Amino acid sequence: MVYLKRPYFRKSRSCPLAQCPDEDIDYKNRALLSKFVSEYGRILPSRITSVSSRKQKLLARAVKRARFLALLPYC
């Protein structure tokens, strides 16, 4: 019996922050940052949120600053 591989089609998902300029990703914008942080306080990876690598770096930096200033919890 011959097993055939199923073709894998990856859905192309666009970055949810594509329309958002880089200045809007700010450590003071808690509403935006809380969308990309899990319920345990961890930063969600870009493979789950489908954020581009540039925006992911900006998000991570903003979340870390917000944590340091006690705007977001560490856990």
Curated annotation (Swiss-Prot):
Disulfide bonds: none annotated. Keywords: Ribonucleoprotein, Ribosomal protein, RNA-binding, rRNA-binding. One of its GO terms (cellular component) is cytosolic small ribosomal subunit. GO terms for molecular function: small ribosomal subunit rRNA binding; structural constituent of ribosome. Pfam families: Ribosomal_S18. SUPFAM superfamilies: Ribosomal protein S18. InterPro entries: Ribosomal_bS18 (IPR001648), Ribosomal_bS18_sf (IPR036870). One of its GO terms (biological process) is translation. PANTHER family: 30S RIBOSOMAL PROTEIN S18 (PTHR13479), SMALL RIBOSOMAL SUBUNIT PROTEIN BS18M (PTHR13479:SF40). Binds as a heterodimer with protein bS6 to the central domain of the 16S rRNA, where it helps stabilize the platform of the 30S subunit. Part of the 30S ribosomal subunit. Forms a tight heterodimer with protein bS6. Belongs to the bacterial ribosomal protein bS18 family. NCBIfam families: S18. This is Small ribosomal subunit protein bS18. The lineage of its organism: Bacteria, Pseudomonadati, Pseudomonadota, Alphaproteobacteria, Rickettsiales. The gene is rpsR.
